[in-house]
């Protein structure tokens, strides 16, 4: 599956993103019997069913939520979906605007924004804009990055614009006009700690990522 990335026609393709996902996964299944059972169960799922896609996306988001509940040391925090929807209702994004989350976690903000905008897409061009030129995110943690990509794919965005990087490590002076976005939908990256080199990017030099 990792070869998907090498054989893809470009980074903005479903094949490339699938390769990204499996490139980050380090788990191994040593029992052939267990692997066969997993494959058999997976084969019964209809991934083209919108209902099953949403169920799977909820499972991925629950994983992030459980990571946070197990202890805040990992810096994983789950934002309740009703709160996200309320924020989107206040902002009222429009098709053609770009939406960015610099610490996107499971991409809950981006998924909910897509669900808000999708009914407003009356033309094929609108759907193409939502698919390719609307939602952008960055995520530092490997597992959350993988879950974000899977979550967006399951919601209907086939080639998510999610980058595996630490947003706080970027020098503000290097940000160009093309890197700007119309809307930022995000929570501060609660619960994390940053090394001193990263702190140099900010006027207030503290390790706490939320500040």
Where are these regions (language model features)?
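Phosphate-binding glycine-rich loops and adjacent basic patches that engage nucleotide phosphates
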Residues: 1-5, 16-26, 44-53, 106-115, ...
